[in-house]
Amino acid sequence: MSEIAKEMNKFLREKDPVIFSLLSDFGREIYMPKGIISQSAEAKLHAYECNATIGIAKEDGGPMYLPSIKKFFNNLTPSEIFPYATPYGLPELRKLWREKIISENELKNKEISLPVVTHAMTNGLMLTGDLFIDKGDEIYLPNMMWGNYNLIYRIRYKANIVNYDFFNSSLTKFNVAALKEALNNCNKEKVVLLFNFPNNPTGYTPTQKEANAITEILLDLAESG
C-alpha cells in the first residue's frame, strides 16, 4: 500500500473510525498523487505562456480559444469555459453546497468535508462502488429498480443484490414491512442499502410518514449492532 494511502487511512481512522470501517479494500488503497495537485497549483501561478501540466496554450493572459465557440456562451469568461474542470467541482460551489447541507440537516457545529461533484448519477454510483463495495457484499434494492444497478454492482463489483417488494399488496404505498423483513434476515455485519428517489422506473417517492418509518428501522438496526 502506498505511503500516501497509509497516511490518509490513519487520518480517517482517527477522525471517523466508523466511516473508515465502511471503506472497501480498493477505497483504502486509492489516493490522489500529491504531485498532480501541487504541480497544477504552481502552474496556475507561474505558467504565463504554456501550462505543460495539462497541455493548455495561453493567449493574452488566458486560455487560447476559438471565438466561434466562445460566442455560444453568455457571461462566462474564457478561463471559466475552456480549461479542464477541477476533479471535484468548483471550490466556490462546493463551499456553498456544504453550507446548504449543514443548514438543512441540523449539522451546525459538525465537521464535514466538502461535497464532491460527479459526472451525473451513474458516475456517482460507480464512485460509491469503488469506495464502499467489496466482492460478495450484499446490496439491498427494491424489486422495481433501475436495470443498470445489475450491471454496476452485480457484474462490475461482484456484489450480491437482495431485492425486497417495493410496493405493498395494494400497490399504493412503500412497503416498509418488506424492507424491515429483508434487513432483519441479513446475517452479515455489513449492510448496503441504496435508495434513489423518485424511484426508477415507478417514479414513486416515500411520504414523510414512510420516510420516518424507514429512519426508525435503520436506527433500530444500528443500535442493535
Regions found by a protein language model. Name each.
Residues 2, 6, 25-119:
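N-terminal small-domain helix-loop-helix segment of the aminotransferase-like
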Residues 5-25:
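Generic N-terminal amphipathic, Lys/Arg-enriched alpha-helix
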Residues 11-15, 68-69, 110-112, 124-125:
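Short, flexible segments with low predicted structural confidence
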Residues 23-24, 66, 175, 207:
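Helix N-terminus capping/helix-initiation residues
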